[in-house]
Curated annotation (Swiss-Prot):
A Pfam family it matches: UreF
Keywords, sorted A to Z: Chaperone, Cytoplasm, Nickel insertion
Name of the protein described by the UniProt record: Urease accessory protein UreF 2
Alphabetized InterPro entries for the sequence: UreF, UreF_sf
Function: Required for maturation of urease via the functional incorporation of the urease nickel metallocenter. Disrupting the ure2 operon has no effect on urease activity or pathogen survival in BALB/c mice when administered orally.
Native organism: Brucella abortus (strain 2308)
Keyword Transport: no
A Gene Ontology molecular function term of the record: nickel cation binding
Top-level taxon of origin: Bacteria
Length: 243
């Protein structure tokens, strides 16, 4: 009888966490229909300029992009997640505008608002949450830009996913976007990209600890090469991706 009770308790605990895990898998999936496959996070230009040309330079590019995202969009995600849980709509608009203003080039701005709007449309349709529906109306009426990290923070808050896991899903998305694009743009194998992904995901927990308590005023990104590559990409004649 004791053994049976313990087993049931273990299962109950596992079942309570299972929905959150599945929500993470769904909203962290690169196949989520919000247009992420159309963007390469600057990889296309990096390859054209021969800055990325083999698996080692691809690894360095991926880790750099994740680090940059952690201190910019990652902080935005966490602050938006906290604001959503507090139903602080004024704070959400401040965060959203701050994200948009820190995107220095046309392509990164296009990427964040296009994916952000698509994600909010999806969330408002499939999650029973008033804040997500109201946020979509704010985007449609141009009251707020509707950036991706803010929309992601709102979705995960509505699904009761905690901030640490939400940050992990975002970082995973950055890595898989780049590595998925790499398979279409350069000579690299699935084995190579999976090895890079395994290493990259091991950096997420330390990155979270560094920015867990950061506020929107701490959001920063210094990656001039990324901005230069984006500018080059805008004028490119042959492009597979939108950025």
């Amino acid at each position: 009888m004791t053994m049976r009770t313990a087993t049931i308790t273990e299962f109950s605990s596992s079942y309570r966490s299972l929905p959150g895990l599945l929500h993470l898998l769904q909203f962290g999936d690169s196949a989520l229909p919000i247009g992420g496959f159309s963007f390469s996070n600057g990889l296309e230009s990096a390859i054209q300029q021969n800055l990325v040309h083999d698996k080692e330079t691809l690894r360095e590019f991926t880790l750099t992009a994740m680090n940059q995202a952690a201190t910019s969009d990652g902080i935005a995600l966490l602050t938006a997640h906290r604001a959503a849980r507090a139903d602080d709509r004024g704070a959400l608009q401040v965060i959203d505008k701050a994200v948009f203003e820190r995107k220095l080039n046309e392509e990164t701005r296009l990427m964040t608002v296009r994916m952000g709007r698509k994600l909010c449309e999806l969330s408002a349709s499939i999650i029973d949450d008033r804040l997500n529906r109201d946020w979509l109306e704010c985007i449609k009426t141009a009251e707020t830009p509707g950036t991706h990290p803010v929309s992601l923070g709102l979705a995960f808050a509505a699904l009761d996913v905690d901030g640490r896991d939400a940050f992990g899903a975002q970082q995973y998305g950055v890595a898989t976007t780049i590595l998925g694009a790499a398979l279409r743009l350069m000579r690299v194998s699935f084995m190579d990209t999976q090895k890079i992904l395994l290493e990259a995901t091991s950096t997420v927990a330390p990155a979270y600890e560094e920015i867990a308590d950061a506020g929107i005023e701490d959001m920063a990104s210094f990656a001039p090469m990324v901005d230069i590559l984006a500018a080059v990409h805008v004028k490119g004649h042959v492009r597979m991706f939108m950025n």
